[in-house]
Amino acid sequence: MRVRLAKEDVNSNYKVSLIDVSREKDFVKILEDYNIKYKRTEYFKDLFMYKLIDINSKFIMILQEKASNYIKYIEPVSIYSLPLQIEDEDGEIPVVYPEENKDYVTLGVIDNGIAHIKHLDPWIKRVHTRFLREETSTTHGTFVSGIALYGDKLENREIVKNEPFYLLDATVLSATTIEEDDLLKNIALAIEENHKRVKIWNLSLSVRLGIEEDTFSDFGVVLDHLQKTYGVLIFKSAGNGGNFMKQLPKGKL
């Protein structure tokens, strides 16, 4: 049983993976005996997680005593986030419009929404969201979509040399942060409902935890499963750290 505790051992939400699923009822009984609130999320067959709400090392010690032989690991739930601030720069570039009777690929933007500004509105083909518009800020998704469509023009040089494309706004979070289980369910729903028309997806959310040296994360496993199940490609950002602003060496992925 691998254990990783939250910083300063404050009460936090933890995720638990079982190595022996036949003991699931025993595990649930322990949770209920100690009045622990929990949420079970099944991503696909044979991959599910338990999220234990608001616990600390005291209850984790109980799990080590009573269930260490069938728990694979317990660790804080990963929290994915967006930049809190995006710098504005003055300038203007011409609006690009779709040509009539021309087919364009559609890019799925998995983010916090895309604002219907004049540069992007002609290209937004569809909006997939579980949130009310007033609940979303559309800051980061708009930023990402603008770079995707106008990147070469903003740089005033050819870097990507790509053709324009339609956008599918896949809004998967309403605030600036979201816990891993909720995020993955939202991503899965967006791809499940739109995979026939959208084969390329961009995912530029961040997580503050470093990668493991010898194992794949649950997040990566679920994304791979979605790619194989629905025949899509998901492009995930990595290494977007801030060390360069402090003139420090590159950090670990």
Annotate each PLM feature.
Residues 131-143:
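Gly/Ser-rich catalytic serine loop of serine hydrolases
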Residues 10-13, 100-107, 163-165:
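A short, charged/proline- and glycine-enriched loop
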Residues 26, 173-253:
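Substrate-binding/access-modulating region of protease and related hydrolase catalytic domains
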Residues 1-97:
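Autoinhibitory propeptides
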Residues 110-117, 145-163, 189-194:
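Flexible, small-residue-rich helix->loop connector segments that border functional cores
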Residues 92-132, 147:
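Acidic-leg catalytic submotif of subtilisin-like serine proteases
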Residues 148, 154-176, 199-204:
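Short helix-loop-beta-strand segments that form the rim/entrance of peptidase-like active sites
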